[in-house]
């Protein structure tokens, strides 16, 4: 059976047993912040098992895409070198949420594996393990299913603690847990290895193909197991492993799915397909990379993006080992989509996007790969012992973008290991430097502790009445704030919006009788709104009633920019692709800043598309609508939630242009899209690997920006004696004339240098039979000095030459040594001395070198070094 047929058979079998077929969840877990990637079929059902979520079904079946690379489950360095380690795999699973339990779970598994209608595996090839004290499961297997006792193995606490066993599953130190039973396939005596539980169990003869976890207990902090009222079942069977069994091969890389990917990888690289470990690495890694990018991950230097970058770069390096020329990895995506796109349509729909991301990352890595490998080879050549020092590993990571496991991979090929602890120490030191650099002053949001929550009035008004419930000065609670004192005021009710979701906090003032407090910013800690500012007059007392008034003009301008970010977000997804995710924003009254995930610079024509889409929505002048609902209803309506953001039971859904933009947002917004008036992007650039930033203006600020640009056009036209209509032609003519003049200048300088060369050759002094010439030629650039040194070397025939110039406020130096002397005297050595004398650096070949510096006053002193340099070397 082919892998795709096995997958479909599994899903269909359990559907016939009353299970609901559930699609694979994303590789980015949406309900578990402790997980880097989805790594098991049960991840998406975690809340069902915990009783926190009720679904319309109590039986489920799925084929879940999983990634195990980085974090706790990191087998990256083994991938390609063993038969069964992968960064990506499919987990087939059936699940019961308080429905059936051990008897049905065991019967289902056995029927599917051994029945002629399904997989028809020989029963005598199957071994079974149970937890040592799980007599119930043991009896079901032996007395009801009929597995003979000689193929049954009880596994006890083999990990050094109670319930720490290969056959006892726990979610943590406390919580749901229970025994499990595993089914193993015996590949036969030709393969080394022993049955589970034996000293030889790590061999490849007996391979686990199915695991049934029985969530039977709740473990409390005292270690006691309490029976769960509704026990559940979580099972998993690796598709790749069972495919190897059914296709009668002993390595996962020999199954049909991998054979096609290996062939595609060999073709893209231009190498043979002979089972090389490096080719297996590439074939494995295209799966994890393709699926991760399809699920919205982009290469970066942190978190999930960094794991993706590590996998891509490892694949590139192994392709390079096999002789790949240029970018190759992205070319295998088509084969991946053809092989797995039927079961996972996102591979086909996002094929072009995946290819673009991989190609861009390959090209970026290629720039440093060769140089980094050369540095590593130099370090390894000087290595004493068999451990690569941590500082070397860190240098390669920090300077050349080599992930630690890539260096470990290269070291492994030379039977070396790396000093991981030393690398981590270097990383910790770097993090500490970063923390020190980012230290800043007092943070009221962490210092202020307020039990009461503030009622927010600002969605409906910019003015309101409230009462002072807390005052703070220098982070300390006080009873009053006097005139001229800076501090924080907390009210029971306020119309001031507190900084959140990228929107800056409101400003304005609080009036308490004769006392006035100028609010410069508003933030939030817990449920309390903190009004930061200074007492302009009088004194504020706890308990005093106040009139709160927001600066409505500033808030209105800010709200327009905030609404524009929502329109921009959707426009970005339409123009660049659905992989775009918000990575940060800053919205104030002057402009908006929007950070988003993308792998390359946004092209000028794409900028125009973005502006056209946003301005089209503005011109439609549709209402900006809000609705309070629960999170699941909001998501069902297509509302975008920011990844990593925490949402309560009730969320605020903001819709613009009907269903054009639907997001969860608690900010202040325009009433209608037409209020924004105009949208103009003023800059685009990168802020981090895989993260781009757009800055834009709206309304009056956008009009002012365009007016200023118009004035600049007019001024430019006047400078070239033209007008707006012929400005481009005029500028082109000026630039062409400038190019011609520069060419003429170069020719004149060359003639002058040639004439100077004739004169200079006469100024050379003789040192031990060689001519030594040092001269100052102010105004000449490096190019002219190089040409002159070449000319002088020909004239003098047997010489050391050092020329210097003051050019545009800096020192330019060129040194030359004729070939016959370059084995004794090296121009690069002379240049290092001369450049150092003028506060700079330099270097080059033995016969020619360049340098420079900033200390013009020391130029003559630097030139004087030529004669003693020659005297010492000859």
UniProtKB/Swiss-Prot annotation:
Gene3D superfamilies for this protein: 2.40.30.130, 3.10.310.40, 3.30.54.20, 6.10.250.550, Bira Bifunctional Protein, Domain 2 (3.30.930.10), Threonyl-trna Synthetase, Chain A, domain 2 (3.30.980.10)
Cofactor(s) essential for the protein: Zn(2+)
UniProt cross-references to Pfam families, sorted A to Z: DHHA1, tRNA-synt_2c, tRNA_SAD
Enzyme class: ligase
Catalytic activity: tRNA(Ala) + L-alanine + ATP = L-alanyl-tRNA(Ala) + AMP + diphosphate
UniProt keyword annotation of Ubl conjugation present: no
GO CC field: cytosol
EC numbers, comma separated: 6.1.1.7
Cofactor binding note from Swiss-Prot or TrEMBL: Binds 1 zinc ion per subunit.
GO molecular function, one term: tRNA binding
Binding-site positions, Zn(2+): 562, 566, 665, 669
Top-level taxon: Bacteria
Keyword Aminoacyl-tRNA synthetase carried by entry: yes
Keywords: Aminoacyl-tRNA synthetase, ATP-binding, Cytoplasm, Ligase, Metal-binding, Nucleotide-binding, Protein biosynthesis, RNA-binding, tRNA-binding, Zinc
Cell location: Cytoplasm
GO BP terms: alanyl-tRNA aminoacylation; negative regulation of DNA-templated transcription
Family: Belongs to the class-II aminoacyl-tRNA synthetase family.
Domain notes: Consists of three domains; the N-terminal catalytic domain, the editing domain and the C-terminal C-Ala domain. The editing domain removes incorrectly charged amino acids, while the C-Ala domain, along with tRNA(Ala), serves as a bridge to cooperatively bring together the editing and aminoacylation centers thus stimulating deacylation of misacylated tRNAs.
Function description: Catalyzes the attachment of alanine to tRNA(Ala) in a two-step reaction: alanine is first activated by ATP to form Ala-AMP and then transferred to the acceptor end of tRNA(Ala). Also edits incorrectly charged Ser-tRNA(Ala) and Gly-tRNA(Ala) via its editing domain.
NCBIfam families: alaS (TIGR00344)
Listed name of the protein: Alanine--tRNA ligase
Organism ancestry: Bacteria, Pseudomonadati, Pseudomonadota, Gammaproteobacteria, Pseudomonadales
């Amino acid at each position: 059976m082919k892998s795709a047929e096995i997958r479909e058979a599994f899903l269909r079998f359990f559907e016939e047993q009353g299970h609901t077929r559930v699609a694979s969840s994303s590789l980015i877990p949406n309900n578990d912040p402790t997980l880097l990637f989805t790594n098991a079929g049960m991840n998406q059902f975690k809340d069902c098992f915990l009783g926190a979520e009720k679904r319309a079904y109590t039986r489920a079946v799925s084929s879940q895409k999983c990634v195990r690379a980085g974090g706790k489950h990191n087998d990256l360095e083994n991938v390609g070198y063993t038969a069964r380690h992968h960064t990506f795999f499919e987990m087939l699973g059936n699940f019961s949420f308080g429905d059936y339990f051990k008897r049905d779970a065991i019967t289902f598994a056995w029927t599917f594996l051994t029945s002629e209608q399904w997989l028809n595996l020989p029963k005598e090839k199957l071994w079974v393990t149970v937890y040592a004290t799980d007599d119930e499961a043991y009896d079901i297997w032996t007395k009801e299913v009929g597995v003979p006792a000689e193929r049954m193995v009880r596994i006890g606490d083999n990990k050094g603690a109670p319930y720490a066993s290969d056959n006892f599953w726990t979610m943590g130190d406390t919580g749901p847990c229970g025994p499990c039973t595993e089914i193993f396939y015996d590949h036969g005596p030709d393969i080394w290895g022993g049955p589970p539980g034996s000293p030889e169990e790590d061999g490849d003869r007996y391979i686990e193909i199915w695991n049934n976890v029985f969530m039977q207990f709740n473990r409390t902090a005292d270690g006691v197991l309490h029976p769960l009222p509704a026990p559940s079942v979580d099972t998993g069977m690796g598709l790749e492993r069972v495919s190897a069994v059914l296709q009668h091969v002993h390595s996962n890389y020999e199954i049909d799915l991998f054979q096609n990917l290996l062939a595609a990888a060999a073709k893209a690289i231009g190498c043979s397909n002979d089972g090389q470990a490096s080719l297996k690495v590439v074939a494995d890694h295209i799966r994890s990379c393709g699926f991760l990018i399809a699920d919205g991950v982009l290469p970066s230097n942190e978190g999930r993006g960094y794991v993706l970058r590590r996998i891509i770069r490892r694949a590139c390096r192994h392709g390079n080992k096999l002789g790949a020329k240029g970018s190759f990895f992205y070319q295998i995506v088509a084969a991946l989509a053809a092989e797995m796109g039927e079961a996972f349509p996102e591979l086909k729909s996002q094929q072009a996007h995946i290819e673009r991301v991989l190609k861009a990352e390959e090209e970026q890595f290629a720039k440093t790969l060769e140089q980094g490998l050369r540095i590593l080879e130099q370090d390894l050549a000087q290595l004493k012992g068999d451990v690569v020092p941590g500082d070397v590993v860190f240098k390669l990571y920090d300077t050349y973008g080599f992930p630690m496991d890539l260096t470990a991979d290269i070291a492994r090929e030379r039977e070396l290991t790396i000093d991981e602890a030393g690398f981590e120490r270097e990383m910790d030191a770097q993090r500490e430097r970063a923390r020190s650099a980012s230290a800043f002053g007092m943070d009221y949001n962490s210092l202020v502790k307020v039990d009461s929550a503030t009622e927010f009035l600002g969605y409906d008004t910019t003015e309101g009445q409230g009462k002072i419930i807390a005052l703070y000065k220098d982070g300390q609670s006080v009873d009053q704030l006097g005139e001229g004192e800076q501090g924080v005021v907390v009210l029971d009710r306020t119309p001031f919006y507190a900084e959140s979701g990228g929107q800056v906090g409101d400003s304005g003032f609080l009036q308490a009788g004769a006392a006035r407090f100028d609010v410069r910013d508003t933030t939030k800690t817990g449920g309390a709104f903190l009004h930061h500012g200074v007492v302009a007059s009088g004194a504020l007392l706890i308990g005093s009633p106040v009139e709160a008034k927001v600066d409505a003009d500033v808030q209105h301008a800010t709200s327009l920019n905030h609404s524009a970010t929502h329109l921009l977000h959707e426009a970005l997804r339409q123009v660049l692709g659905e992989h775009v995710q918000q990575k940060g924003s800053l919205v104030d009254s002057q402009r908006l800043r929007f950070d988003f995930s993308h792998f390359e610079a946004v092209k000028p024509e794409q900028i125009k598309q973005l502006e056209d889409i946003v301005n089209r929505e503005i011109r439609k002048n549709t209402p900006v609508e809000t609705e309070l609902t629960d999170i699941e209803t909001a998501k069902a309506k297509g509302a975008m939630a920011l990844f990593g953001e925490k949402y309560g039971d009730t969320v605020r859904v903001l819709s613009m242009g009907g269903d054009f933009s639907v997001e969860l947002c608690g900010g202040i917004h325009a009433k209608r899209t037409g209020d924004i008036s105009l949208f103009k992007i003023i800059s685009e650039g990168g802020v981090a690997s895989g993260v781009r930033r757009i800055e834009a203006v709206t309304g009056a600020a956008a009009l002012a920006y365009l007016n200023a640009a118009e004035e600049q056009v007019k001024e430019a036209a006047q400078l070239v004696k033209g007008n707006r209509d012929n400005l481009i032609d005029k500028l082109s003519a000026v630039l062409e004339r400038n190019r011609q003049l520069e060419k003429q200048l170069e020719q004149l300088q060359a003639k002058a240098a040639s004439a100077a060369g004739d004169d200079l050759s006469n100024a050379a002094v003789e040192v031990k039979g060689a001519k030594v010439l040092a001269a100052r030629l102010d105004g000449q650039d490096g190019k002219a000095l190089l040409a002159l040194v070449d000319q002088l070397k020909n004239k003098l025939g047997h010489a050391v030459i050092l020329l210097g110039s003051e050019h545009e406020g800096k020192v330019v130096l060129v040194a030359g040594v004729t070939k016959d002397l370059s084995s004794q005297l090296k121009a690069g050595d002379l240049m290092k001395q001369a450049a150092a004398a003028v506060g700079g650096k330099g270097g080059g070949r033995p016969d020619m070198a360049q340098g420079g510096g900033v200390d013009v006053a020391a130029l003559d002193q630097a030139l004087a070094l030529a004669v003693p340099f020659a005297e010492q070397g000859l």
